[in-house]
Amino acid sequence: MGLSSYLLDKFLNHHFKGTAAGTAPATLYGSIHSANPALTGANEVTATYFSGRASYTASNFSAPATLGNYRQIVSTASLNFGTSIAAGSNLPYFGFWDAATGGNFLGGFAFTDSLGSEILLNFGNGDTVSRASGSIKIGLDINAWSIYARDLQLNWLKGTGMGSAPSTNDVALATALTADGTITEITATVATGGRFSIPSANWSAITTVGNTRQIQTTNDINFGAAIAAATGFNAIGLFSSTNLIVFASVSTQNIVVGQELIIPASKFKVSLGNV
């Protein structure tokens, strides 16, 4: 469960391919699903049990906060489906859309109890069905994506736009790099031109890989020959101006003078999704 392919593509296009995410929805619409909605909103059964999707004000989520390896927002109001028109049993998932009917699927999630354990939704015909404030939690991992980027994405779901899309991203080499953007950078030490700039046009089309959406660079990332030695190189970061977007660990290695610092296009990939 997690974000839809529509939303994953929107975020990848914004961060890397120069197409802004655009206006964020002020209202989300909750749906019920009989099985995994996957990336597209499959298995929706809302109309079987209710007169329509549940309207929810997007701003009624908490500010993003770190919980373990995730940035998370939590509902601050109830999600009300209204009075059921048929009894429902063992319904496992709900989703959010940007319209009361049709529209774009934004993401699907399991129903959970107050402890975060997955549960099944059951109700009788004529019951009033709702999910209490605090029961809806949306978390995005910060294992490879920065806190800055995840907060942009979560706040978009809360109704706050992401602003203008960057026209370039810059690749940095480091001996230490964390999700909050703290970096021990060696790029300027080993590379004549410093960080390597990737124009938004130099990314591939977005493709599906497993439960993720993925892009890769269409040109090599070539820093040239190292102008100085460096020890303990173990991380690569991709920045938008001064803000870290994504990062990755690499096998620790020492850079020697004259070493060609090249990442082939086929090896530099960015994935966003539900792993």
Please name every model-derived segment.
Residues 1-92, 98-234, 240-275:
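Small cysteine-rich, disulfide-bonded extracellular modules of the LU/uPAR three-finger superfamily
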